[in-house]
């Protein structure tokens, strides 16, 4: 009788373990699909940033791309700690040069709950508004995104620097 009880308990536990494994596989599949959708959404957001930036539509860059409390850390400049400061930075830069992003490739995007981390490389040209030939550039960037209450992603932190080697030393 004891052997039969143990056998029944073993079969029940085995059945429960099998059903839990199936649920876990389904949960993993759903989670993976959610992560893939989030990665695609962030890559689409970056592509929209490129489109708006190239059109010099900086007001829409602010509303579409950046979180309300975003911080931009450009090289050799103080951190821009508000969307208004970021907008002013874009506008001042645009007064001097025409920046055109040819490509922006997100090399890696990692999702962690309501935060995401991405790094990539942009290439393009800078043309002085005062005249002169376009100068090619390549930069690497690192961004942190946060999921908003409406489930949209927005950039919370952005920093970038030149991807080219230093051509002169002080």
Please give the residue ranges for each predicted region:
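Positively charged n-region of N-terminal signal peptides that target proteins for export
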Residues: 1-4
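Bacterial N-terminal signal peptides
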Residues: 8-16
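Short, low-complexity N-terminal intrinsically disordered segments enriched in polar/charged residues
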Residues: 20-64, 169-170
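Short beta-strand edge/turn micro-motifs at domain boundaries
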Residues: 21-26, 138-166
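A solvent-exposed, acidic/Ser-Thr-rich amphipathic alpha-helical stretch
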Residues: 39-40, 58-112, 121, 133-136
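Residue-level signal for tight coil/turn positions that link beta-strands
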Residues: 113-115, 150
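Generic short beta-strand segments
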Residues: 120-127
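Extracellular loop and loop/strand-boundary signature of outer-membrane beta-barrel proteins
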Residues: 129-131
């Amino acid at each position: 009788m004891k052997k039969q009880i143990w056998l029944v308990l073993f079969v029940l536990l085995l059945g429960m373990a099998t059903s839990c494994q199936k649920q876990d596989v389904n949960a993993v599949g759903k989670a993976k699909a959610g992560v893939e959708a989030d990665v695609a959404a962030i890559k689409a957001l970056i592509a929209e940033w490129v489109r708006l930036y190239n059109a010099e539509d900086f007001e829409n860059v602010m509303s579409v791309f950046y979180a309300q409390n975003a911080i931009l850390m450009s090289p050799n400049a103080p951190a821009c700690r508000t969307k208004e400061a970021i907008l002013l930075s874009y506008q001042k830069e645009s007064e001097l040069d025409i920046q055109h992003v040819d490509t922006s490739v997100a090399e890696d995007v990692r999702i962690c709950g309501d935060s995401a981390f991405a790094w990539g490389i942009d290439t393009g040209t800078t043309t002085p508004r005062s005249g002169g030939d376009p100068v090619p550039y390549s930069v690497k960037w690192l961004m942190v995104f946060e999921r908003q209450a409406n489930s949209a992603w927005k950039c919370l932190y952005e920093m970038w620097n030149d991807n080219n080697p230093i051509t002169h030393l002080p």
